[in-house]
């Protein structure tokens, strides 16, 4: 087993995934509550995608020696990062090509059985407009930075997918 595979099978690798998602969520809350930048519906959906990556990291951390746990973690990671990238690209398009016919809704469209914007309004209730660009860093908007972040998650996933999925189904009791 290579060092790369051993790292992929360790809790530390999944901790880094979880920690990066926590850092992104903390940054989002900093922008919202300290810098007073209102999140739009697409921002809330992206926030949910980051929570999906966080959850995938927590799943992977539970028992990374077991292949089934790693597979579940990878699936959550892949689905959340892909969905987040799709949302971030759509938001960049909305901001770069504003149209009165292409707007986002005022309330998120969560399922009736899971109204996250009602349960957690401090985190999941949108208060901004999708076409607003209230912040830039080195000429790159927040939506464009999220394209970078989700693309980064997918690149790391591609680097790690073979080592994560390789190896035994369960750890040996005799090593």
From Swiss-Prot:
InterPro entries: DiS_bond_form_DsbB/BdbC, Disulphide_bond_form_DsbB, DsbB, DsbB-like_sf. GO terms for biological process: protein folding. It is found in: Cell inner membrane. It is a multi-pass membrane protein. It comes from the Bacteria. Keywords: Cell inner membrane, Cell membrane, Chaperone, Disulfide bond, Electron transport, Membrane, Oxidoreductase, Redox-active center, Transmembrane, Transmembrane helix, Transport. The chain crosses the membrane at residues 14-30, 49-64, 72-89, 145-163. PANTHER family: DISULFIDE BOND FORMATION PROTEIN B. Belongs to the DsbB family. This is Disulfide bond formation protein B. It comes from Shewanella oneidensis (strain ATCC 700550 / JCM 31522 / CIP 106686 / LMG 19005 / NCIMB 14063 / MR-1).
């Amino acid at each position: 087993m290579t060092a790369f595979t051993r790292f992929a099978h360790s809790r530390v690798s999944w901790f880094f995934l979880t920690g990066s998602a926590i850092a992104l969520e903390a940054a989002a809350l900093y922008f919202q509550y300290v810098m007073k930048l209102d999140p739009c519906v697409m921002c809330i959906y992206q926030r949910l995608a980051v929570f999906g990556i966080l959850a995938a990291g927590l799943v992977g951390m539970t028992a990374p020696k077991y292949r089934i746990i790693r597979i579940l973690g990878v699936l959550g990671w892949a689905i959340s990062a892909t969905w987040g990238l799709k949302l971030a690209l759509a938001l960049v398009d909305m901001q770069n090509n504003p149209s009165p016919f292409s707007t986002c809704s005022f309330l998120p469209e969560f399922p009736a059985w899971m109204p996250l914007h009602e349960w957690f309004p401090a985190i999941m209730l949108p208060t901004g407009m999708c076409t607003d660009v209230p912040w830039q860093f080195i000429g790159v908007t927040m939506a464009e930075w999220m394209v970078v972040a989700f693309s980064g998650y997918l690149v790391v996933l591609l680097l790690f997918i073979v080592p994560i999925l390789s190896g035994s189904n369960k750890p040996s009791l005799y090593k």
